[in-house]
Amino acid sequence: MSRRHKAEKREINPDPKFGDLVITKFMNAIMFDGKKSVAERIVYGALDVVESKVKSDPVALFHRALENVAPHIEVRSRRVGGATYQVPIDVRPDRRQALAIRWLISAARGRNEATMIDRLSGELMDAANNRGSAVKKREDVHRMAEANRAFSHYRW
């Protein structure tokens, strides 16, 4: 279905504690049922745990973790003459960030620590050190793109 107009980007405010737009996006992605205060408590709690364990700037570690998880290339399905090919394409910067946030959160939710604060802080520290489920997901996506490099001429 086509749209008449491109959807406008909504303006979001930076988070109150660190003044960072990406942390606000991360909170919004963690949030369930519009409960922003719960999401804030989880994210700020996780960043406090990271700060106490690593003894360095938690925001810098958060950004490093996001950068380590963000994919540079992915595969998209494309039908050509009755066959469906997995065509590798570059990932746009806004989508890179969105995928990194989504993968970090799903990896944290998949861990088996007691609280979400512990899970998220553990996953952030792992991702910052190029370990963990979220980084594995990125490597799988890159491996898939590498395996299908033969179809890269089907880009659109």
UniProtKB/Swiss-Prot annotation:
Listed InterPro entries: Ribosomal_uS7, Ribosomal_uS7_bac/org-type, Ribosomal_uS7_CS, Ribosomal_uS7_dom, Ribosomal_uS7_dom_sf
Alphabetized GO MF terms: rRNA binding; structural constituent of ribosome; tRNA binding
GO annotation, biological process: translation
CDD domains (alphabetical): uS7_Bacteria
PROSITE patterns: RIBOSOMAL_S7 (PS00052)
Pfam families: Ribosomal_S7
UniProt keyword terms in alphabetical order: Ribonucleoprotein, Ribosomal protein, RNA-binding, rRNA-binding, tRNA-binding
Cystines in this chain: none
One Gene Ontology CC term in the entry: small ribosomal subunit
Subunit structure: Part of the 30S ribosomal subunit. Contacts proteins S9 and S11.
UniProt-listed PANTHER family: RIBOSOMAL PROTEIN S7
Family according to the record: Belongs to the universal ribosomal protein uS7 family.
Role this protein plays: One of the primary rRNA binding proteins, it binds directly to 16S rRNA where it nucleates assembly of the head domain of the 30S subunit. Is located at the subunit interface close to the decoding center, probably blocks exit of the E-site tRNA.
Name listed for the protein in its UniProt record: Small ribosomal subunit protein uS7
Organism: Bartonella henselae (strain ATCC 49882 / DSM 28221 / CCUG 30454 / Houston 1)
Lineage, top ranks: Bacteria, Pseudomonadati, Pseudomonadota, Alphaproteobacteria, Hyphomicrobiales
